[in-house]
From Swiss-Prot:
GO terms for molecular function: magnesium ion binding; malate synthase activity. Its EC number is 2.3.3.9. InterPro entries: Malate_synth_C_sf, Malate_synth_sf, Malate_synthase_TIM, Malate_synthG, MS_C, MS_N, MS_N_TIM-barrel_dom, MSG_insertion. It is found in: Cytoplasm. This is Malate synthase G. Its cofactor is Mg(2+). Belongs to the malate synthase family. GlcB subfamily. It catalyses: glyoxylate + acetyl-CoA + H2O = (S)-malate + CoA + H(+). Glyoxylate binds at R341, E439, G464, F465, L466, D467.
């Protein structure tokens, strides 16, 4: 039984109430009684609106389902389909042209293109690593990944391999040649560095040369010519620091004494309360809120054990350099600028219950997140004894990513929620900025109207291929069987979706004002492939794109040196490369020509993916992790990948491509494989052979067999219910 404290119409879990009063409110000048009265009023006023938006989702889905069922044997008439969507209010009139007016936004969002990390906020170690990933060693990123092949004697090994190290150095020199070229020759020929009359000089066998663009020299640290100093360069707004120490193990092997090349990497990071976490009750939510508070105050720390040693990880300080003329100082942020991703409009959480007449109901989690992440983020706007030593925003803004919104009415509701939160917190209107995830179909086809609804708050739009595909499947569930999951990336609607997001953002004035982002690279171990392929995102006009790790951020940062995103956006300005008909093209299988073994392969792949993720989520509360696929390739999985897999199988089940028996048989085949993949985890509880005793196995089965009934195909209702059952069982056994 949850211990609760009454606050007006609210009954608040004591763990949350005490956290807010004892930890979050001190230093904000907000009176606790007035704060809780404000929370009560916001919940009372906005809950009916939230409920109505969810009813509208269900109403539209029911109308679309009915329309498709009446035409299931006919080819899709795209004109009739478009007209129908207009008639029911799904597809809205496009607004007149406008320009966003958001103000008070940090440079990391407005002018600096670079990688964006997404990390589960419930894990303090991950959160600290991500916040500190603003700067990363290129040498380490190259040496420790497959970007440098382990061939020709270049194996990683258990100790430093000079052959591999030399390949790393050569790769880094080639990078410097492209990002900050010399006026002649190559960085590979460098034998020393110096600063003369405020200019960087690079010594080579043929003499001393400067940079092709001298202004790219931004500063230095240490005493010039000393054994241990560094040079700061800048290109496309991103910094590169060359560390020089001829006495270091690596510097000894380098003709110029360079021991490392450090890149400005994760310019921004999203601390996630949503798809990458498993937060189902007050204890889970408070853990996340406390970590978010520590990140904003700058006092979050974590004991870390590595190589037999234990140390305390803390947030990095800012970095100070001497300006090129030797007379001034340049200070650069030592940490990533932090966003926080709240949950969407769907879920409730029993951290707070409220009285609706005679009935007690859980409060919508999205309303709670706006209030409590907004409150704790106040500490990131100022420094002091009560607020901590570090600052997040230098312009007085709090950045909140809002996911899974369906259309402009839901965006407008979020903006109203943010405005009400600002009133409760005593913040100026417009302090809470919004990042709009373009990951639901009704938002995609009405994106311009969605942006207009937040024109004075929006700082980011982002395509999320994974969730967007899940909604694509669920919206058109009754239209017929969908193509296989792996074929989705080559569909008409996907290209139109990615292009339209950039075009509409640029037309709304995002250049120089807000981020245009693109999605995650999920294959955490395949960094060579990432370096080869992910450059396509900045080439497409995106100022940021998601990466799964600090190492990936450093490697992806190279792409923003190779590509001038600002120039790409100028070239794309004014273009409209897609039509609404392309966006509405449903990815239906043209004919069911799959061989039985192909169907079995698809079902097994998806069942293994579902089990591999769900077993950790439900049994251990792990919301994001590297999950080996059926071929043992590690993939960064979260609820978005789960949504696709479960919805595809639900679709095939609905249209008779597979049967319930096929699903159960595949789950039973894949469970022992997943068990084996987790065998080294001492806390892991196998699903096989007692499948029906495993709540994780049953959750996976529920997600597929009842997938057509889940609201918009979301996985949270089933996951939360089963996770709560696991926690209840554990509490009873204790």
């Amino acid at each position: 039984m949850t211990d609760r404290v009454s606050a007006g119409n609210l009954r608040v879990a004591r763990v949350l109430y005490d956290f807010v009063n004892d930890e979050a409110l001190p230093g904000t000048d907000i009176d606790p009684d007035s704060f809780w009265a404000g929370v009560d009023k916001v919940v009372t006023d906005l809950t009916p609106r939230n409920q109505e938006l969810l009813r509208r989702r269900d109403e539209l889905q029911a109308q679309i389902d009915k329309w498709h069922r009446q035409r299931v044997i006919e080819p899709l008439d795209i004109d009739a389909y478009r007209d129908f969507l207009i008639e029911i209010g799904y597809l809205l009139p496009e607004p007149e042209d406008f320009t966003i007016t958001t103000s008070g936004v940090d440079d990391e969002i407005t002018t600096t293109a670079g990688p964006q990390l997404v990390v589960p906020v419930l894990n303090a170690r991950f959160a600290l690593n991500a916040a500190n990933a603003r700067w990363g060693s290129l040498y380490d990123a190259l040496y420790g990944t497959d970007v440098i092949p382990e061939t020709d004697g270049a194996e990683k090994g258990s100790s430093y391999n000079k052959v591999r190290g030399d390949k790393v150095i050569a790769y880094a020199r080639n990078f410097l040649d492209q990002a900050v070229p010399l006026e002649s020759g190559s960085w590979a020929d460098a034998t020393g560095l110096s600063v003369e009359d405020g200019r960087l000089q690079v010594a080579t066998a043929d003499g001393s040369v400067g940079l092709a663009e001298p202004a790219k020299f931004a500063g230095y640290t240490g005493q010039l010519g000393s054994p241990d100093w560094s040079v700061l360069l800048v290109n496309h707004g991103l910094h590169i620091e060359i560390l020089i120490d001829p006495q270091s193990p690596v510097g000894k092997t380098d003709r110029a004494g360079i021991k490392d090349v450090v890149l400005e990497s994760a310019v921004t990071t999203i601390m996630d309360f949503e798809d990458s976490v498993a937060a189902v009750d007050a204890d889970d939510k408070v853990l996340g809120y406390r970590n978010w508070l520590g990140l904003n105050k700058g006092d979050l720390s974590e004991e870390v054990s590595k190589d037999g040693k234990t140390f305390t990880r803390v947030l990095n300080a800012d970095r100070t350099y001497t300006t090129p003329d030797g007379q001034g100082e340049l200070t650069l942020p030592g940490r990533s600028l932090l966003f926080v991703r709240n949950v969407g409009h769907l879920m409730t959480n029993d951290a707070i219950v409220w009285s609706d007449g005679d009935e007690e109901k859980e409060v919508f989690e999205g309303i709670m997140d706006a209030l409590f992440t907004g409150l704790t983020a106040i500490h990131g706007l100022k420094t002091g004894e009560a607020n901590g030593p570090l600052q997040n925003s230098r312009t007085g803004s709090i950045y909140i990513v809002k996911p899974k919104m369906h259309g402009p009415d839901e965006v407008a509701f979020t903006c109203e929620l943010f405005s009400r939160v600002e009133d409760v917190l005593g913040l100026p209107q417009g302090t809470l900025k919004i990042g709009i995830m373009d990951e639901e179909r009704r938002t995609t086809v009405n994106l311009k109207a969605c942006i207009k609804a937040a024109a004075d708050r929006v700082v980011f739009i982002n395509t999320g291929f994974l969730d967007r595909t899940g909604d694509e499947i669920h919206t058109s569930m009754e239209a017929g069987p969908m193509i296989r999951k792996g074929a989705m990336k080559n569909t008409t609607w996907i290209k139109a979706y990615e292009d339209a997001n950039v075009d509409i953002g640029l037309a709304a004035g995002f250049k120089g004002k807000a981020q245009i982002g693109k999605g995650m690279w999920a294959m955490t171990e395949l960094m060579a492939d990432m370096v080869e392929q992910k450059i396509g995102q900045p080439k497409a006009g995106a100022t940021t794109a998601w990466v799964p790790s600090p190492t990936a951020a450093t490697l992806h940062a190279m792409h923003y040196h190779y590509v001038d995103v600002g120039a790409v956006q100028e070239e794309l300005a004014g273009k409209k490369r897609t039509t609404i008909e392309q966006l509405l093209t449903i990815p239906l299988a043209k004919e069911l020509a799959w061989a039985p073994e192909e169907i079995r392969e698809e079902v097994d792949n998806n069942c293994q993916s579902i089990l591999g993720y769900v077993v950790r989520w439900v049994a251990q509360g792990v919301g994001c992790s590297k999950v080996p696929d059926i071929h043992d390739v590690a993939l960064m999985e979260d609820r978005a990948t789960l949504r696709i897999s479960s919805q595809l199988l639900a679709n095939w089940l609905r249209h008779g491509v597979i049967t319930e028996e096929d699903v159960r048989a595949s789950l039973e085949r894949m469970a022992p494989l997943v068990d084996a993949q987790n065998a080294k985890d001492a806390a892991y509880q196998p699903m096989a052979p007692n499948f029906d005793d495993s709540l994780a196995f049953l959750a996976a089965q529920d997600l597929i067999l009842t997938g057509t009934q889940q609201p918009n195909g979301y996985t949270e209702p089933i996951l939360h219910r089963r996770r709560r059952e696991v926690k209840a069982r554990a509490a009873q056994s204790n």
